[in-house]
Amino acid sequence: MTTACLPLRVELTNTDTTASSSTLKQICATVISEGGYEIRGNAAEAKLPIGSPRDLTVASTVYPLISLRLKSTRLDGIAILDSLNVLGITNNANYCWEIVQGGTTSGGTWVTNSSSSLVEYNITATSYSLGAGEVLTAGYAVGSNQGSTTAELHRDNLFEYQLERNSFTSTPVELILVASSDTAGADVLASLGWQETNR
C-alpha cells in the first residue's frame, strides 16, 4: 500500500458474461493497525546555512524560516515532519517560533534534496501569510552568550505534522516554520527533518 491516507475503495468486476447488470452493496469498511505504527522511511532535512542565519529585521514581525510541501508530481506521497531545531544566536533576544499548516510563503525558491524526494522546501522566502492556515505548535527560545536554548518538536503524535494535499484542487499544503523576536535585527538558525515513507 503506497498511500494509506487515501479512502478505501471497493470495485466489482465481471469476469464472464452475465445475463443482467451486476450490483454491489458495500456497507462499511475498517482498517485496523494492531501494535501501533512506527515511522520507517527515508530521512531528509532542510536547514538554514550556518553562515547565513535568518535576520528578523523588525521586532515582533513573523518571518518564514523554512517551508515544506509535497511536490506537485508526488501528491500521493506520505511525508511526516519528525524533527525541529530553532536556535536564536543574538545575545539577550527572545524568540517565538511556530509550525503553521496551510499558510502561504512569498518569494524565495523551492528546491528539493533529490529527484526521488517527495518534498520540496524553501529557505529563502521573504514573507508569509497565515490566511486560512492554523498554528499546530509553538514555543519560545532565548539567545544568550551563556548558551542559547533550542526548540524541539514534541514526538507524541507525529501524524499531526504530516504534509497534506488538497484533494479537490490537487495542490500541496505548506507546512511552515516561522519565527519572530522582541529584538530588531535578531538572527536565528533553524532546521526541519522529515521521513518519506513511500519514496
Task: Label the model's feature ranges.
Residues V31, S170-P172, S180-R199:
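C-terminal interaction-tip segments
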Residues T15-T17, N92, G102-T104, D182, ...:
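Generic structural motif
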Residues G102-H154:
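Terminal beta-strand-rich extracellular "head" domains
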